[in-house]
Amino acid sequence: MTDGGMLISPSALQDPGDGARPEDIAMDCTDGEEELCLEEILTLYSQPINEEQAWAVCYQCCRWLTQKHRRKETGVSPPGRIAGPGDVRIRKDGNVKLYQPSNPDKHTPPSSSIEIIESLGIMIYKALDYGLKEHEERELSPPLEQLIDLMTNMADTETDCPDEGYEATEEEDEGEEENAEVSNVRGYRDIISLCLSHLPSPSDAPNHYQAVCRALYAETKELRTFLEKIKSAKENLRKMEGETEEPVRDLNELQNADWARFWVQVMRDLRHGVKLKKVQERQYNPLAIEYQLTPYEMLMDDIRSKRYKLRKVMVNGDIPPRLKKSAHEIILEFIRSRPPLNPVSARKLKPHAPQPPTLHERILEEIRSERKLRPVSPDMIRRSRLGAGKSISTPQDLFRSSDIPDGPRKLAISTLSLANGTSPARSPVNGVAGGHSLSQRKRLLKAPTLAELDSSDSEEEQSTRKSDSSSSISTSLVEDTSPESVMGKKPPPQFLPISSTPQPDKRIAPQRRHSIEKEAPTNIRHFLPPSRQNSKSLAHALGSGHAEEFCFPVECLTLTVEEVMHIRQVLVKAELEKFQQYKDIYNALKKGKLCFSCRSKKFSLFTWSYTCQFCKRPVCSQCCKKMKLPSKPHASLPISSLGPSILPKKEPGASSAPTDKTSSTSSHKKNSLQRSLSRSSKHGDRSSSKDELELPEQFTEDWSTMEVCVDCKKFINDIISNSRRNLSTKRARLHRRTHSVYSSSTSSSNYKPTERTIKEV
C-alpha cells in the first residue's frame, strides 16, 4: 500500500480476470473520441483507481443522477442500475455520465434511487479493488470506507425496525447520537453532502472533483499514446531484424503492465513529490491534492517560477575539475595531450603521379610546337623584287611555251608579274633554262611587292566580288595544252594567288589551286561550282584576299557587330528619355504603341508593329527595312567588314533571269581581268570606287535577313563608311611614301594588254 492508496505489489501486475490484454482493449465502450469509460481506464493501467479519483467519480455520478431525477418529472425515462465500471463515461472536460441502454425492458419495473445508489457504491468498490486476488483486500481510509458502507447498506438500514420491548443502555444511546447525522442518508443529495464534507473548503468541491476527472482522462490518453508508440517501435524493430515468426516472450522484456506501473509511479512522484527518506506519517491526509494542473504542467510552472534550489556537487570538498572547465578547454587539453605531429618540413610526400594532359593542353602544345616562320626584312623583299624584273615573261611567251610537252610542269606567270609592269623577256625553251626560271618565279611569288601594296584597293574588290573571280584571272593567263590533264591522269598546274601572304622559303602553303584545261585555242572552259569538300579551303583562300583590307592599322576604334548593336540600344534609351516631358508620347513609345522612328504611326489590334532586331524597338512597316546580319557566333566580326553585303539584293525578273545571268558572268570575268591588269596605271587605284566591296556568298550563306529600322540602317552605314574612309586615307599616305620606288621602273612597265589579247586569252 502506498501513500496515495495505489498498490504497486507484484499482484497488481496480474492480468484481469476476464483474460483481456491491455493492448487488445478498443474504444467500443465510448460514444466518441471525447470520452473514456472507466473499465477501459482500469484495463489500460491494470491497477485500481486511487481514493481521490473514487471520491471524484462518486460526486460526479451523483450530480448526473440528480439532474436526471429532475428531468424524470418532465417525462424523461429514469436511469437504471449501474452494471459495472463500463457504464461510467468520463468526458474530456471532467464531467461524468452513466450509460443507459437504448431499448430498456418495459416489463422490468424502474429502479429506485436507493437501488441506484447501492449499485453505484458497489461499482466504486470494484474500481478500488480492481486487479486484486480473492484473498487480498485493500485497506481504505475511514471516510471513504464509511461512505461505501452507507451506500451499499441503504436497503438494510431502511427495513430495520427497533424492538419495542428492548431498552438500550446509555452507552448505546450515545453512540447512536454520534452516528445520527451519517446514517441519515436518503438520496443523492446526502451522498453529495458527504463528498463536500470530505474537502476543507466545500465551495471548491465542484471544481476540484471535475479537475480530478479531467486529469484522469488526460493521463489515460497520454499513456495510451505512449503504449502505441512502444508497440509500433517494437514492430518496426522486428521488421528490421527480419523476424517472420512471432518471437517467444522474453522474461526481461517489459510488457504493457510494466509500462503502466512505471507510468503511475512517475505521475504520483511528480504530483506528490519525491521523498528521499521515509518519514512516519498518518496514512490518511485530509488535505486535498492539486489536480488543476497535470504533473508536466506543474513541473514546468516550477521551472518558470524558479521554485527550485540547485546544490553544488562537491567531490572531496571541492568542485570536480570537469565542471570548472568549458567544453572547448577540455577538447584543447585532450589535443595537447596527444603526441605532437611531425613538422611539415620533415614530411616527405610520395611523388605525384603524372596525369595525362587534357585536350586543351594538347591543343596548346601543338600550337606552340608549330614551326616558326622566318622573318623577312623589307630590304630583302625590295631587293629581290627589283632584281627579278628581268626574268618575267609576257603573255605571248606563255602561249609559245604552252606548245612544249613540258609546259604543264612550268609555272607561266601570275597576275603579280603583270602588276609589277616589268619589261617582257623571252623565257628559254630548253628544260634547264625553264627550270631555272621556274624556280626563280617561285621565289618571286613568296612575298608581295610594294606595287601590290599600292594597288590593294582594287585587288580587294576583285578578290571579294565573287568566289570565281580569282580563278577567272588565272584561267585567262595560264593554259595547259597537255591532253593528260583533260583526262585527269596528271595533276594540273598550280600557282599561288595574288593575295597570298608572305611565307618562308621552306614552307609550301598554297591556299588555293585551280586546274586549267584547254579545249580550243580561243575558248576557255568555265569553272564548276565548288563542292562541299573543298568549300572550306576555297572560302579560306577567298578570305586571304579580303584580309588585305585589315592588314593596315586603322586610326579609329574597330567595333564589332555586337558592340555596335549595344551602342545603338544605349542611344535609343537615351533618345527615349528626351520625351519624358511629353507624357503621352513617352508612354506610347515606352509601351510600344507608337512607331519609334517616325513617331506618327500608332499600333492597334489590327495594325501590328515590327520589332527592329538591332535596337529592339517597335517600328511601322514603312520604317522597317531588311538587312543581312551575322548570327550569334559571327557577332564578333568587325562592323567595317560587312560592307554592302548586309543589304538584300534585288532579284531580277523571271523573264530576263537566264540572259542576265550569262551576260553578267562573261562581263564579270572581263571586268575582273581589266581591274587586275590596270593596277600599275595611275588611275587604277580609284577606278573601282563605284564597285563597293562585298563579302563572298559563301561567307553570308548562314546569315539571316533581319528586320531593322531606317535609323539603325543609317547608323550602320555611317559607321562602315567612316571606317573605310579612314582606311583609304591610310593607304593613300602609304602610296605617297612608296611612290619613289615606281619611278625607277623600265619603259616596259607601261605595257597594257589590248582588249583583243584579253579576249584571246
Swiss-Prot record:
* Free-text function comment from the UniProt entry: Acts as an actin nucleation factor, remains associated with the slow-growing pointed end of the new filament. Involved in intracellular vesicle transport along actin fibers, providing a novel link between actin cytoskeleton dynamics and intracellular transport. Required for asymmetric spindle positioning and asymmetric cell division during meiosis. Required for normal formation of the cleavage furrow and for polar body extrusion during female germ cell meiosis.
Transmembrane residues, as ranges? none
Q: Which residues form a coiled coil?
A: 218-246
Region (Disordered): which ranges? 1-23, 160-183, 375-406, 419-539, 630-694, 728-761
**Which comment does the entry carry about domains?**
Binds to actin monomers via the WH2 domain.
Q: Tell me the organism.
A: Danio rerio (Zebrafish)
Q: What is this protein called?
A: Protein spire homolog 1
Question: Where is there biased composition of kind Basic and acidic residues?
Answer: 504-520, 682-693
